């Protein structure tokens, strides 16, 4: 089952400095945050190319229970990757519902 979160939940993870891996395949969101929150987001960022996500998670021995948040432009690519990660045994995978486009909309409404 695909776990979806929105701006409010992502913002809580960042502002609350909750540990998670952030795989951003979309536009940058660092500029939305103050320096302290930005530092947490930078530490959470798992920089990789889309085709290298699985090999890099495996190579870095990322535990299957690690919280992983995926963001892309519209949520489509992230959803496909999340399904693949879940098939491989990752149990704590989240997709930004609607991707960057929806994230911007929800942020403006907050």
Spans of model-derived segments:
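Rhodanese-like catalytic fold shared by cysteine-dependent sulfurtransferases
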Residues: 1-20, 25-67, 73-110
């Amino acid at each position: 089952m695909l776990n979806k979160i929105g701006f409010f939940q992502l913002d809580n993870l960042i502002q609350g400095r909750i540990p998670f891996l952030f795989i951003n395949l979309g536009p940058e969101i660092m500029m939305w945050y103050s320096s302290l929150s930005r530092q947490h987001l930078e530490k959470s960022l798992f920089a990789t190319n889309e085709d290298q996500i699985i090999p890099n998670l495996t190579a870095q021995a990322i535990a299957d229970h690690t919280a992983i948040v995926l963001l892309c432009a519209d949520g489509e690519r992230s959803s496909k990757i999340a399904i693949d990660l879940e098939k491989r045994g990752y149990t704590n995978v989240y997709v930004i519902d609607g991707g960057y486009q929806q994230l911007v909309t929800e942020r403006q409404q907050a």
